Amino acid sequence: MTMALKKVLAIVLAGGEGNRLMPLTADRAKPAVPFAGGYRLIDFALSNLVNSGYLKIVVLTQYKSHSLDRHISETWRMSTQLGRYVASVPAQQRVGKSWFLGSANAIYQSLNLIHDDAPDIVVVVGADHVYRMDFSQMVEQHIASGAKATVAAVRQPLNMANQFGVIEVDQNDPQKIAAFVEKPASTPGLAADPTQFLASMGNYVFNADALVEALHVDAERLDTKHDMGGDIIPYFVDQGEAGVYDFTLNDIPGATERDRTYWRDVGTIDSFYDAHMDLISPVPIFNLYNSEWPIYTRQSISPPAKFVRGENNTVGTALDSIVASGVVVSGGIVEGSVLSNDAYVAAGSRVQDSVLMDKVRVGEGAVIKRAILDKNVKVPAGAAIGLDPALDKARGYKVTESGITVLAKGQVVPEPGEAELALSAQHRRGLPEAVKAATHDDPDIRDSAEKVAAGIQSRVADAAAQGAAH
């Protein structure tokens, strides 16, 4: 049977808690975490499947799935009369009284979905990675190879081996897996590049009957964690029936040379932050603006973003940033940041190298640097976030080892004291980094810009003093 005649069912594993992304996952499943101003993490997996031509998709959910289920129902509506659907399927205890015990058990408990649709091929993908991929190319290789299971693979730095499934390729057949170990303490590097190893992307293609058989075998075992990477893939490797798909071979329309093999696991706060910073350069490491392979999401009903002068005639600006619908920058300065829908940045404030989610409000003269603020956080005037790790920790904010400060959804920011006001005032001085770079070779323009900045800061200070007097 040719690929065009094969029936394909896609299963998205979206039940993970995402403990390493806390506090962003305190009230939502990891695939529902907002990303890049207006998306949810799951939008990347679903967009890739839809763009690949796969329009029968089930999403297996479990942990705090309300916002995820709502997003899927409001965003991913298809014509069910034509046999197309994206269906959110929660844990239902169809097999015994337990909830999903692992990724493999999630599919095992949902085998009725496979039996009902009777596909030839099952594509299984994770819901929390940022990338573009044409799965039809992977399916085509899978069918041609005769393998019963195929794993998508990407090269990663050797020091990250303990975070991924590690693939060893058969020396006589580069499309066959010789060994697969889930998250080993260490692993040898590739022969072609000893600094890298071949990591599983968590994306799989199976012959449907072979997958069903493997899941039944796994369910009967006592020595299993019911995990796709830890148990099901090794089962096929032991049988000599597991293939590997090299992600670098995947060809995406409209991709740039820089982002064509981009894949980011955003399972930690630091990697989540870094993925945002990958978006904002003029030639980004990952290009959101590829209209030939769009990433779909629910369209905001908010009005366009607006940049206006503040009450003290300070100019609202955003440099090297992504700004979503409904954002108002009223006399503040935004640099190297991502602002989600309906965020507000007041006069004299500065947001630098940060991620602000929906409806975050930044008060006058506040400074935010290298921080992630979840929805509905209100930052009072003159506050300093991300400038002093000890101060941030004392106020109950999460601070990562690399120095990223994270505020949870709706977290209360206390009014700043004198020391904090002085700290934020110190960091408001001077030109934005982007302006410094742009005027590096023109001292006259740099001097003029510095005078304007000094004037703005003086007016902000005067306004703050007047407010304190009253």
Swiss-Prot record:
<dbReference type="Pfam" id="PF00483">
    <property type="entry name" value="NTP_transferase"/>
</dbReference>
<comment type="subunit">
    <text>Homotetramer.</text>
</comment>
<dbReference type="InterPro" id="IPR011004">
    <property type="entry name" value="Trimer_LpxA-like_sf"/>
</dbReference>
<dbReference type="InterPro" id="IPR005836">
    <property type="entry name" value="ADP_Glu_pyroP_CS"/>
</dbReference>
<comment type="pathway">
    <text>Glycan biosynthesis; glycogen biosynthesis.</text>
</comment>
<dbReference type="Pfam" id="PF24894">
    <property type="entry name" value="Hexapep_GlmU"/>
</dbReference>
<feature type="binding site">
    <location>
        <position position="200"/>
    </location>
    <ligand>
        <name>alpha-D-glucose 1-phosphate</name>
    </ligand>
</feature>
<keyword id="KW-0321">Glycogen metabolism</keyword>
<feature type="binding site">
    <location>
        <position position="165"/>
    </location>
    <ligand>
        <name>alpha-D-glucose 1-phosphate</name>
    </ligand>
</feature>
<dbReference type="InterPro" id="IPR011831">
    <property type="entry name" value="ADP-Glc_PPase"/>
</dbReference>
<dbReference type="GO" id="GO:0008878">
    <property type="term" value="F:glucose-1-phosphate adenylyltransferase activity"/>
</dbReference>
<keyword id="KW-0808">Transferase</keyword>
<dbReference type="GO" id="GO:0005524">
    <property type="term" value="F:ATP binding"/>
</dbReference>
<keyword id="KW-0320">Glycogen biosynthesis</keyword>
<dbReference type="InterPro" id="IPR056818">
    <property type="entry name" value="GlmU/GlgC-like_hexapep"/>
</dbReference>
<keyword id="KW-0067">ATP-binding</keyword>
<dbReference type="GO" id="GO:0005978">
    <property type="term" value="P:glycogen biosynthetic process"/>
</dbReference>
<keyword id="KW-0548">Nucleotidyltransferase</keyword>
<keyword id="KW-0119">Carbohydrate metabolism</keyword>
<comment type="similarity">
    <text>Belongs to the bacterial/plant glucose-1-phosphate adenylyltransferase family.</text>
</comment>
<dbReference type="InterPro" id="IPR005835">
    <property type="entry name" value="NTP_transferase_dom"/>
</dbReference>
<protein>
    <recommendedName>
        <fullName>Glucose-1-phosphate adenylyltransferase</fullName>
        <ecNumber>2.7.7.27</ecNumber>
    </recommendedName>
</protein>
<keyword id="KW-0547">Nucleotide-binding</keyword>
<comment type="function">
    <text>Involved in the biosynthesis of ADP-glucose, a building block required for the elongation reactions to produce glycogen. Catalyzes the reaction between ATP and alpha-D-glucose 1-phosphate (G1P) to produce pyrophosphate and ADP-Glc.</text>
</comment>
<dbReference type="InterPro" id="IPR029044">
    <property type="entry name" value="Nucleotide-diphossugar_trans"/>
</dbReference>
<dbReference type="InterPro" id="IPR023049">
    <property type="entry name" value="GlgC_bac"/>
</dbReference>
<feature type="binding site">
    <location>
        <begin position="182"/>
        <end position="183"/>
    </location>
    <ligand>
        <name>alpha-D-glucose 1-phosphate</name>
    </ligand>
</feature>
